[in-house]
């Protein structure tokens, strides 16, 4: 089969590799659509990921498709079933899993390789995080289940209350998903900050009450205070993964606010925090990572409901052979998400 392999920093190659064969408890799907992700872009640019993968490796982690092979012991699925698989599954046995803190599981089973014609799903993911796709839901929408599950997890951990003013920093796919979830389901006022006018316009379509191009602003915290009676935002969600923006997020918060530091920064980076602000303003700073089986199911259900036009996030469909060009387009912010069709 044709598959993308990551060998290092911006070193992505399409190669012919053996078709996968399922072992006990596993299934193999024919990929119908694999969507690109901001995490993929960061991994491509950085040459690896602290938890998910180490080069050389098959690449990509969002996909939907159809089961074409079933391993020994698999009884809940049949060849021909349309499915979407999360890119991980918890062990269900460790200290954290016993406390239902599944995203902290040190034994997470990770799966990469969606940018390929076929994808093998490991047995733990088949058991805990493989879901049937509703008949009328296109593969490219179902493939966005994993990132939306992360966003639903992040939203649930952000202490959002009715009527809050919520600031989202970042107009990538994750930031826009946060806007959509917050605006449609939580009755809050969302202020979106980003650097691309086209993406900010999509943010408005997804429910942002106000959008701001940070390139045209002297100072983001000052603008936020103008919209919040000089206090700052009730909740701030950072969705860029840049240490400087983590610091900006904290500066945007009112006393008593929650700051969700959602975007993963490069390894071994640090930030500076004003201890006086943190202590006397009683700020809550949260790092939120990945998703859980509960949110994977909730994400697919939300996408399938079609209440929110998540298709706005898919800029185009492209053949797998164009993958490197697509990543260059993502780097220059010409596209948000692209559905790769093997």
Q: How would you name each of these model-derived features?
A:
Residues 7, 18-19, 54-60, 107-113, ...:
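Short Gly/Pro-enriched turn/cap motifs at secondary-structure boundaries
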Residues 18-34, 48-95, 131-136:
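Glycine-rich beta-strand-centered segment in the early N-terminal region that forms part
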Residues 82, 137-217, 222:
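Mid-domain Rossmann-like dinucleotide-binding core that forms the NAD(H)/NADP(H) cofactor-binding site
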Residues 91-169:
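NAD(P)H dinucleotide-binding glycine-rich loop of Rossmann-like/cofactor-binding domains
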Residues 158-160, 184, 201, 205-284:
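Glycine-rich cofactor phosphate-binding loops and adjacent beta1-alpha1 units
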Residues 196, 265, 291:
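Residues in the short beta-alpha loop(s) of Rossmann-like NAD(P)-binding domains
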Residues 218, 247-251, 292-342:
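C-terminal hydrophobic helical "lid"/dimerization subdomain
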